[in-house]
Design a protein with these regions (language model features):
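Compositionally biased linear targeting/interaction segments
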Residues: 1-272
């Protein structure tokens, strides 16, 4: 009986030791990931600041999506600069553009997309107590429109903005590939072709396949800058700043950041 009791005690102690060892390993891994995230965030912010400084020196508005390679402290990072008129402006987009967005990107049938697009227009045009149109203050406000649930918003969130006044049209040179697909009526091959021509720096990009009633040109002073910082596990850490390139005497900088976000882009794992 004594021997059996000793064996049970030894087994219990080994289980406790194993659990403690696993807990220590997990905590060490979490600390390592937190340290990597903090370092990647600082590197991404530094790369964005360098690109912003160059944009301020050039004093020339960027009219198309472009990617800048930034070497910093022995790391090579890509910073994507996107003028916000490459997104669908919730406060000025016409009903046909919103309906196309809901159909192509949102996955809704046309019979549901058209009335929902009109509901979005009705929401932003509704008058406040002061008599001004209510308008969308942030893209998240889209979920206040009846019929827009979180799943639909998640499919649209990266394609819309409430931070500019674009006149209702989209600049295809600045548009992400998913927005190009909306402008192309769902033609993914055409959107990819235009995106490839644009990324190659081609001067005259053929836009004839896009719906001419939905596109426009021009420049804005608001941009999304996104730095991609590679991390040791093969993934990337994305640092994003939404900025207004205008002098501000309050802080002395020639730009103002009005939104920031950070996220992890996991490494692609081969399928088993």
């Amino acid at each position: 009986m004594v021997l059996i009791a000793v064996l049970w005690i030894v087994m219990a102690l080994s289980i406790i030791v194993t659990g403690l060892s696993r807990s220590v390993r997990d905590e060490a891994k979490m600390l390592s990931m937190a340290r990597q995230g903090a370092q990647a965030s600082a590197l991404g912010d530094a790369a964005i600041q360098l690109v912003l400084q160059q944009m301020a020196v050039d004093a020339k508005p960027v009219d198309r999506m472009t990617t800048v390679q930034v070497p910093y402290q022995g790391r090579q990072m890509d910073v994507q600069v996107m003028p916000l008129n490459g997104l669908v402006d919730l406060n000025s987009a016409k009903t046909p553009l919103l309906a196309r967005l809901l159909t192509v990107a949102g996955g809704l049938p046309e019979s549901a997309a058209e009335p929902l697009a009109q509901a979005i227009v009705d929401y932003r045009e509704r008058r406040t107590a002061q008599g001004a149109p209510r308008r969308f203050e942030a893209s998240e406000d889209l979920m206040r429109v009846p019929g827009v649930n979180y799943d639909l918003y998640a499919r649209l969130s990266g394609l819309v903005t409430a931070d500019i006044r674009s006149g209702g049209a989209v600049n295809p040179l600045a548009a992400p590939s998913a927005v190009l697909q909306v402008l192309a009526g769902g033609n993914a091959q055409l959107a990819q072709q235009i995106d490839s021509q644009r990324q190659s720096g081609q001067a005259g990009v053929d836009m004839t396949g896009l719906d001419a009633t939905l596109i426009g040109s021009g420049t804005v002073r608001r941009y999304r800058l996104q730095a991609r910082v590679p991390v040791p596990d093969g993934g990337s850490f994305l640092v994003t700043r939404y900025v207004d390139i205008n002098p501000r005497s309050r802080d002395g900088l020639p730009w103002t950041t009005f939104h920031m976000q950070r996220e992890v882009e996991p490494a692609l794992r081969p399928s088993p």
